[in-house]
Swiss-Prot record:
SUPFAM superfamilies: 4'-phosphopantetheinyl transferase (SSF56214)
Lineage of source species: Bacteria, Pseudomonadati, Pseudomonadota, Acidithiobacillia, Acidithiobacillales
Biological processes, Gene Ontology terms: fatty acid biosynthetic process
This protein's name: Holo-[acyl-carrier-protein] synthase
Function: Transfers the 4'-phosphopantetheine moiety from coenzyme A to a Ser of acyl-carrier-protein.
Length: 129
C-alpha cells in the first residue's frame, strides 16, 4: 500500500546560479556527507548534481507530508546508491522519525532523471507488498 508520494522538478540553471552565488555555503547546507563525497568538481556537472539532489529531497519531504517544517533539515535526506547503482534514500534526523511514524515495513522508492535544463525526482513510500 502506498503511504506517501512526492515529486519535484528543478531548473538546473537555477542551481547553477545559486551555486555561483553561495558556493560552498550552499553545498554545506544542502548536502550530507554521503553526497558531498559524490559532488562533481566541474561547474556544469555540479549544478546538475545539485539539481538532482534538491529535487530528490523536496520529493521526499512531500512524500513524508512535511516540507521544511518541524525541525526538518536538508541533510536529513541524503541520496546514496545500492550496489547496482540505483539511487536510494538515506534518512536521518526528523525525516527518519517521520518515516518511522508511518509504521513498520515502510520502504522508499526513488527515481531521479535529468536533461540539460531540468532535473526531477519521484519518491514513493510503500508499506508491505
Amino acid at each position: 500500500m502506498i503511504v506517501g508520494m512526492g515529486t519535484d522538478i528543478v531548473a538546473v540553471e537555477r542551481m547553477a546560479r545559486l551555486h555561483a552565488r553561495f558556493g560552498e555555503r550552499l553545498t554545506e547546507r544542502l548536502l550530507g556527507p554521503l553526497e558531498v563525497a559524490d559532488m562533481p568538481v566541474e561547474a556544469a556537472a555540479g549544478a546538475a548534481f545539485l539539481a538532482r539532489r534538491f529535487a530528490a529531497k523536496e520529493a521526499t519531504f512531500k512524500a513524508l507530508g512535511s516540507g521544511m517544517t518541524n525541525g526538518m533539515r536538508w541533510m536529513d535526506v541524503q541520496v546514496g546508491h545500492d550496489s547496482g547503482g540505483r539511487p536510494q534514500l538515506v534518512l536521518g534526523g526528523r525525516a527518519q522519525q517521520l518515516l518511522r511514524g508511518l509504521g513498520d515495513g515502510v520502504r522508499s522508492w526513488l527515481s531521479i532523471s535529468d536533461e540539460r535544463r531540468y532535473a526531477m525526482a519521484v519518491v514513493v513510500l510503500e508499506r508491505g507488498g
